[in-house]
């Protein structure tokens, strides 16, 4: 159902472990074109966790800055800060974890720092090489990537939209296959989770 072009309700079906049924029955509260709150009347959970997590039952669950950028999402329990380019500079989670981003003057992401508990992971992006805590981990290619720890190639097979559907090893063996809901969530994934880039939609 739509109101002036904005979706005000949405129902999704999905895999509930052994059955298939309603995983989301969402109603949206808007303030103009900005989302103010989401309520989910569905009680079932999806087997892959892609159902909406209704983490707050408040009149206002989403807050924005003067630029219209989201600064609080109470359903996900996050707060977002932005830099002068209006790019996210830090995301704070309700459990105390943080993700901090560093960009070049052109807005290209150079570094991500994850802090979870007492563990800090620093990821640096240097052209097509990804470093983790100072060690080169991946070399990105047009066809996929090379894992630098074992010097093995991994190839992406994409669909007509450019979504990564299958990842194969250098011998052509399947490592991962992904099947998507129309909204982008993975409803089935076979094999190992060998790459993070999935739905492009």
Explain the meaning of each model-derived region:
Residues 1-53, 106-108, 113-115, 121-122, ...:
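Conserved catalytic cores of ATP-dependent inositol ring kinases
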Residues 2, 29-30, 65, 83, ...:
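Short, acidic, Ser/Thr-enriched surface-loop or helix-capping motifs
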Residues 9-15, 37-42, 66, 71-76, ...:
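Beta-turn initiation residues at beta-strand->coil junctions
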Residues 20, 28, 150-201:
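A motif-centric feature for acidic-aromatic and gly/ser/thr-rich catalytic loops and repeats
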Residues 25, 58-60, 76-78, 98, ...:
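Short loop/turn microsegments at loop-to-beta-strand junctions
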Residues 26-28, 61-62, 80, 101, ...:
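A residue-level detector for well-ordered beta-strand positions
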Residues 49-81:
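Extracellular repeat-rich scaffold modules on cell surfaces
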């Amino acid at each position: 159902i739509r109101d002036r072009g904005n979706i005000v309700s949405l129902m999704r079906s999905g895999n509930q472990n052994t059955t298939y049924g309603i995983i989301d029955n969402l109603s949206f509260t808007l303030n103009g074109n900005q989302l103010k709150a989401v309520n989910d009347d569905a009680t079932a959970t999806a087997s892959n966790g892609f159902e909406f997590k209704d983490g707050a039952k408040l009149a206002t669950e989403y807050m924005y800055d003067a630029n219209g950028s989201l600064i609080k999402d109470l359903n996900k329990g996050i707060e977002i800060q932005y830099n002068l380019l209006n790019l996210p500079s830090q995301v704070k989670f309700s459990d105390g974890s943080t993700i901090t981003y560093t960009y070049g003057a052109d807005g290209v992401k150079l570094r991500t720092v994850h802090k979870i508990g007492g563990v800090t992971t620093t990821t640096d992006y240097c052209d097509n090489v990804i470093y983790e805590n100072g060690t080169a981990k991946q070399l990105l290619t047009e066809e996929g990537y090379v894992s630098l720890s074992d010097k093995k190639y991994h190839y992406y097979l994409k669909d007509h939209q450019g979504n990564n559907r299958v990842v194969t090893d250098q011998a052509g063996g399947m490592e991962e296959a992904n099947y998507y809901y129309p909204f982008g969530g993975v409803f089935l994934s076979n094999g190992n989770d060998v790459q993070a880039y999935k739905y492009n939609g």
